[in-house]
Amino acid sequence: MLDACLPTGENMAMGTTDSPVLHIRTARTARAEQAQDAAMAAALEAICFPPEQAASPTTIAERMATYADHFWLIEDEGGMLLTLVNGPCTHARDLSDEMYEAPTMHDPDGAWQMILGVATAPAAQGQGLATRLLRTVIETTRVHGRQGLVLTCLDDLVGFYARLGFVDEGLSASHHGGLPWHQMRLTLA
């Protein structure tokens, strides 16, 4: 399980020691702790995405039970979930709609890390947390020797992911939530 700490806010830039500390970790695997992580993740999804795009609490719990090590979380010192990135690994090159609902598509030896969701609590947005967590996910994917990462996003986020090295491959076959999505790929190998 990944567990790292990082300072936040202006104090981080100034290098002071009184800055709040955030913890980056993967989801826990003990049943009671995982249920708590899943509930927090489902609540964050519900806040950050419209109902037709947000994963249900049941789907989040099933995903987490199947691939807890592929749920990356940033939480504050009090344990409040601020940012979440999650998705399965697979040998499929492209992200498909069925991956959103079928956690069993996860293959621990898969060549590609799919990203199904990136969510940051509204009060924590604009602090670079999603960028930091995605960089952690990218490095973890590299360390595990995978070919790369794939995600889909709406038009307004193409530039954000491009700044992290993802390449826009055009409109995806995915119509998750009834919307047109761009498929973005970051090839590592």
Indicate residue ranges for each PLM-predicted region.
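C-terminal "cap" of GNAT-fold acetyltransferases
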Residues: C5-L6, G15, V21-H23, L154-D155, ...
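A short beta-loop-alpha structural element at the N-terminal edge
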Residues: V21-A41
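Active-site rim helix/loop that mediates acceptor-substrate recognition in acyltransferases
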Residues: P50-E77, N86-M105
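Conserved acyl-donor/pantetheine-binding loop and adjacent beta-alpha core of acyl/acetyltransferases
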Residues: M80, L84-A119, Q125, S174-W181
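Conserved acetyl-CoA-binding loop-helix of GNAT-fold acetyltransferases
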Residues: T120, G126-E139
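Conserved GNAT acetyl-CoA-binding A-motif
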Residues: L134, E139-L154
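Conserved active-site alpha-helix within GNAT-family acetyltransferase domains
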Residues: V143, D155-L179
